[in-house]
Regions:
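N-terminal charged segments
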Residues: 5, 17-24, 28-113
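Short amphipathic alpha-helix that is part of the acyltransferase structural core
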Residues: 30-49, 131-162
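A short, internal acetyl-CoA/4′-phosphopantetheine-binding micro-motif in the GNAT/acyltransferase core
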Residues: 81-87, 202-209, 237
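Conserved acetyl-CoA-binding loop-helix of GNAT-fold acetyltransferases
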Residues: 90-94, 210-224, 244-245, 249
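Conserved beta-strand-loop-alpha-helix junction that forms the acyl-donor binding cleft
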Residues: 107-111, 224, 233-244, 260-266
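Conserved active-site alpha-helix within GNAT-family acetyltransferase domains
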Residues: 112-117, 215, 238-256
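Conserved catalytic-core motifs of GNAT/GCN5-like acyltransferases
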Residues: 118-130, 235, 253-266
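A conserved beta-strand-loop-helix scaffold within acyl/acetyltransferase catalytic domains
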Residues: 163-173, 178-203
Length: 266
């Protein structure tokens, strides 16, 4: 997740339109009535401090590649890597071996970087939890399958919601909306730590934005998550305050932990 710090970014506008809101000409106008404060984290959500690690040690263990105490998703599934909260020198060497020079990973606030490792400037994320989200099924949302991956990949390439790899669909349920047989919007499940499921890849074709497809799909995916007794979770680029505020408008709340810093392997 790369933060945009240059005012009202294309990514902000794109995600706002995906969710079906029209926010005027300025970020302030779009978010005037929304609460962007970080909620007090009084719920038992510690597993979310390291969601990739938790997922790869539970529901997603079949996708894991390990070296010592460092674990990552298989490279055609997801870009996420799990690392201990307070990495040892050996952990950093294991990261280097797994990711290679130039690889990037998120680390928690407690991680002390070894000499020569630097934070990626302008990169960071926020985490939002959906304890108040019940979700709403959507009769128009269709279940996407591996046969749809080429079309899903093309939609992601056009809309840039974040990485979507050849086997990302295996991580969970993906729903889409079609017009004249063509996939024009989608959202689905990614990280799956115990008790939680992340909603990701929320995107809408440019020609169909502003119609609420993104909002409907987020709520439809959330409904499925709730049906199996789990709680929805989302991540967003720290600079994308437009999307963050609108996810809050749907009922998500910002956590005071769980936002990674990003590091590039030297």
């Amino acid at each position: 997740m790369v933060a945009d710090t240059a005012g009202w970014a294309d990514g902000d506008r794109r995600q706002i339109e995906d969710l079906g809101f029209r926010g005027g000409d300025s970020r302030g106008e779009a978010l005037r009535t929304l609460d962007l404060t970080i909620a007090d984290d009084g719920t038992p959500t510690r597993v979310l401090d390291a969601p990739a690690m938790a997922a790869l040690n539970s529901h997603h263990a079949r996708f894991a590649e390990r070296r010592g105490d460092v674990v990552r998703y298989q490279t055609d599934v997801s870009v996420w890597t799990g690392i201990p909260a307070q990495p040892t020198p050996q952990d950093w060497e294991d990261v280097r071996a797994l990711l290679g020079s130039g690889g990037m990973l998120g680390v928690g606030a407690a991680a002390v970087l070894p000499e020569g490792w630097e934070l990626v400037e302008g990169a960071g994320g926020v985490q939002l939890t959906g304890e108040a989200i019940e979700g709403v099924p959507d009769a128009e949302a269709v279940l996407l399958t591996p046969d749809d991956v080429p079309e899903m990949t093309a939609l992601v390439e056009r809309t840039k919601p974040g990485p979507f790899l050849p086997r990302t669909i295996e991580l969970g349920t993906y729903l889409g909306i079609r017009r004249d047989g063509r996939l024009v919007a989608m959202a689905g499940e990614r990280l799956h730590p115990p008790g939680w499921t992340e909603i990701s890849a929320v995107c809408t074709d440019e020609a169909y934005r502003g119609q609420g497809f993104g909002r409907r799909l987020v709520l439809a995916v959330a409904h499925g998550i709730r049906e199996r007794g789990e709680t929805p979770l989302m991540h967003a680029a720290a600079g994308n305050t437009g999307a963050i505020g609108l996810y809050q408008h749907l009922g998500f709340r910002l956590r005071d932990r769980g936002a990674p810093r990003f590091v590039r392997v030297p």
